[in-house]
Curated annotation (Swiss-Prot):
The gene is hslV. Its main location: cytoplasm. One of its GO terms (cellular component) is proteasome core complex. SUPFAM superfamilies: N-terminal nucleophile aminohydrolases (Ntn hydrolases) (SSF56235). Protease subunit of a proteasome-like degradation complex believed to be a general protein degrading machinery. It catalyses: ATP-dependent cleavage of peptide bonds with broad specificity. This is ATP-dependent protease subunit HslV. Belongs to the peptidase T1B family. HslV subfamily. Gene3D superfamilies: Glutamine Phosphoribosylpyrophosphate, subunit 1, domain 1 (3.60.20.10). GO terms for molecular function: metal ion binding; threonine-type endopeptidase activity.
Amino acid sequence: MSQKIRSTTVIAVRKDGKIVMAGDGQVTMGETVMKGNARKVRKIYDGKIITGFAGATADAFTLLEKFEIRVKEFSGDLTRAAVELAKDWRTDKMLKNLQALLLVADSKTTLLISGNGDVIEPEEDVLAIGSGGNYAYASALALMQNTNLSAREIAEKSLQIAGKICIYTNGKIITEEI
């Protein structure tokens, strides 16, 4: 019997020269919470880039590894690395079956990378992915437009709100900031 592993809400918020990415810690298999403190956001490239993932964990780690190789290959050029990963992801026989989404950000740019070959830069200074992504996204937009909270506070409060709505999102938040 194969049960779908569900996990995650990850959000990126850019405000006042800061980029913050935060993710909850829950991994769920079927109706069971398997882990409550998974690390879904991390810094790479000497702390200059933040990455986050949603989807199948093994798939996401494979893609993060490939992305990190591309970042090094292109000397930290986030956009070029993202575009090249998206091309690989879409055309490689093994990679195209991977089920995950990636958020990546550096001091200037935030991008969503998908297996469809999409590399999307947000119109707003917020991006969110995962099972609770829409809840976190809506919360963050409201907080950005109606409060003076910092990027970190907006990211964390948005995940807390998503966790109250989405059963696949918990309140154990890990945050990274550049």
